[in-house]
């Protein structure tokens, strides 16, 4: 007998091995019809057809559950493959993973897909869904899978199988009628669960993300549990399109990117004002929190990166250069440099914690297909800091950082924050005991802060677990920003030591921390969060003064000088244009305040104040307006 325990504590007994779907049928036909997959003993998800061969706790996954979304999206990717192979039999399927809010499928085709092709593929998917067919899973021996894909000419699937270790002797093959694909699953049991989908765009990609390899075509899509969720998401996409930081950046003359420097940003004067304002704000955070700001070299001999572990775990993402028979790496991270500063002199336990901060410029060799405006670049600057402390100080330091980070996010207008702990990955440095201690320290710190968090198994960095801060923006999108990581490994690898109270040398704990992360990415997020309507303290131009006629020329200059002397970012528009034209132009540029001066304002020593939201605040004295501006300054 096999006993299945359900989430409400009730139990069902079966004569022998039983599938998730059979359990659902035993409970009722309504649940069986809604069953997508199952979760066994609170752990991994399994297909509805998978057998349970021992006593277990079973949670049946339906479209109402959050876990269903990834299953639906992954199944939709396979449905793309089914439709593409019916319409374009010569195409070769590559990979089709789930991504945030959707999925994509990489495909090799000699003929480029067009928007008309995308519409045809989507229509064929609709037709296939209407057939209401079952998705059938077979666990298949590796050699049979190889034979299957050879017969079908799926060269990329064969390459993926070659990448698998010899321990993989069988794999899941999912049958969509005549179309087959391999996957770990789980997938939906029937196409009726896939009705709420949309294909969104086509882009280029490269096999294995390497520009030296053959080019692929990537079909993006989104899928949801029902049509209402899909429509809400499509509306968010429209809202996001209006907020696209690349469009706003061009319209406001903030930055640009060009082919000669892929993933490298050219900052224009207005954009650099925003950068400097944020940098000065973070610099104040450093100072108030006891960090010493430093600066480390851009390139360092590869021997240091070999010692730190980056060479073995990260070299494919690094840039290298040679000089005088030595190989140097352009730094992808700042941490090894900070350890070198710590190592200049022997520290006592009384000196700890020691906190370093740097606006560290890093470079990472990201695949060209992954680059996206400011949000995914190759050259970036981090508000990077490292704390050297004892194990006993970890909780206090993480707690202080947590409170500091929440204040920073609030100052930038983010209130909805989710906290996650990313736990040990398969590929990592150090032993299990060190990881146990590091993960326990992060949990203890968050418990002390009385906050809730989610745990992400396998998503930590190779040198330590980390706390992640995920922020929701104005249209509900989630962005991962700040992190703090416990690292017991790197100080030992790079020889960092202090003398403890017993006069013995010990390795400090190293905490890696960043609040905004990449400055480039953070500014891109802010542009989209604010939709280009900057809060006054961040706006590249805070005020524009516009005269109505030449008769107010000198008075406008006086107002301009008075505001400049107060430290505000002010422009003056003395052009011989109609005042309505000037107002429209500067309103479209989203300048927070427009001060109009005519004969009445000149006579009374006032300014007529308008906002970029077209609100008329009436006449104010210059001193009253200055007080208003000062209340809106964060730095």
Swiss-Prot record:
<keyword id="KW-0479">Metal-binding</keyword>
<keyword id="KW-0862">Zinc</keyword>
<dbReference type="InterPro" id="IPR018163">
    <property type="entry name" value="Thr/Ala-tRNA-synth_IIc_edit"/>
</dbReference>
<dbReference type="GO" id="GO:0005829">
    <property type="term" value="C:cytosol"/>
</dbReference>
<dbReference type="InterPro" id="IPR012947">
    <property type="entry name" value="tRNA_SAD"/>
</dbReference>
<dbReference type="Pfam" id="PF00587">
    <property type="entry name" value="tRNA-synt_2b"/>
</dbReference>
<keyword id="KW-0820">tRNA-binding</keyword>
<dbReference type="GO" id="GO:0005524">
    <property type="term" value="F:ATP binding"/>
</dbReference>
<feature type="binding site">
    <location>
        <position position="512"/>
    </location>
    <ligand>
        <name>Zn(2+)</name>
    </ligand>
</feature>
<feature type="binding site">
    <location>
        <position position="386"/>
    </location>
    <ligand>
        <name>Zn(2+)</name>
    </ligand>
</feature>
<feature type="binding site">
    <location>
        <position position="335"/>
    </location>
    <ligand>
        <name>Zn(2+)</name>
    </ligand>
</feature>
<dbReference type="InterPro" id="IPR033728">
    <property type="entry name" value="ThrRS_core"/>
</dbReference>
<dbReference type="InterPro" id="IPR047246">
    <property type="entry name" value="ThrRS_anticodon"/>
</dbReference>
<keyword id="KW-0963">Cytoplasm</keyword>
<dbReference type="InterPro" id="IPR036621">
    <property type="entry name" value="Anticodon-bd_dom_sf"/>
</dbReference>
<keyword id="KW-0694">RNA-binding</keyword>
<dbReference type="Pfam" id="PF07973">
    <property type="entry name" value="tRNA_SAD"/>
</dbReference>
<dbReference type="InterPro" id="IPR006195">
    <property type="entry name" value="aa-tRNA-synth_II"/>
</dbReference>
<dbReference type="InterPro" id="IPR004154">
    <property type="entry name" value="Anticodon-bd"/>
</dbReference>
<keyword id="KW-0030">Aminoacyl-tRNA synthetase</keyword>
<dbReference type="InterPro" id="IPR002314">
    <property type="entry name" value="aa-tRNA-synt_IIb"/>
</dbReference>
<keyword id="KW-0648">Protein biosynthesis</keyword>
<dbReference type="InterPro" id="IPR012675">
    <property type="entry name" value="Beta-grasp_dom_sf"/>
</dbReference>
<dbReference type="GO" id="GO:0006435">
    <property type="term" value="P:threonyl-tRNA aminoacylation"/>
</dbReference>
<dbReference type="InterPro" id="IPR045864">
    <property type="entry name" value="aa-tRNA-synth_II/BPL/LPL"/>
</dbReference>
<feature type="region of interest" description="Catalytic">
    <location>
        <begin position="244"/>
        <end position="535"/>
    </location>
</feature>
<feature type="domain" description="TGS">
    <location>
        <begin position="1"/>
        <end position="62"/>
    </location>
</feature>
<comment type="subunit">
    <text>Homodimer.</text>
</comment>
<keyword id="KW-0436">Ligase</keyword>
<comment type="similarity">
    <text>Belongs to the class-II aminoacyl-tRNA synthetase family.</text>
</comment>
<dbReference type="InterPro" id="IPR002320">
    <property type="entry name" value="Thr-tRNA-ligase_IIa"/>
</dbReference>
<comment type="function">
    <text>Catalyzes the attachment of threonine to tRNA(Thr) in a two-step reaction: L-threonine is first activated by ATP to form Thr-AMP and then transferred to the acceptor end of tRNA(Thr). Also edits incorrectly charged L-seryl-tRNA(Thr).</text>
</comment>
<dbReference type="InterPro" id="IPR004095">
    <property type="entry name" value="TGS"/>
</dbReference>
<dbReference type="Pfam" id="PF02824">
    <property type="entry name" value="TGS"/>
</dbReference>
<dbReference type="GO" id="GO:0000049">
    <property type="term" value="F:tRNA binding"/>
</dbReference>
<dbReference type="GO" id="GO:0004829">
    <property type="term" value="F:threonine-tRNA ligase activity"/>
</dbReference>
<dbReference type="InterPro" id="IPR012676">
    <property type="entry name" value="TGS-like"/>
</dbReference>
<dbReference type="Pfam" id="PF03129">
    <property type="entry name" value="HGTP_anticodon"/>
</dbReference>
<keyword id="KW-0067">ATP-binding</keyword>
<dbReference type="GO" id="GO:0046872">
    <property type="term" value="F:metal ion binding"/>
</dbReference>
<protein>
    <recommendedName>
        <fullName>Threonine--tRNA ligase</fullName>
        <ecNumber>6.1.1.3</ecNumber>
    </recommendedName>
</protein>
<keyword id="KW-0547">Nucleotide-binding</keyword>
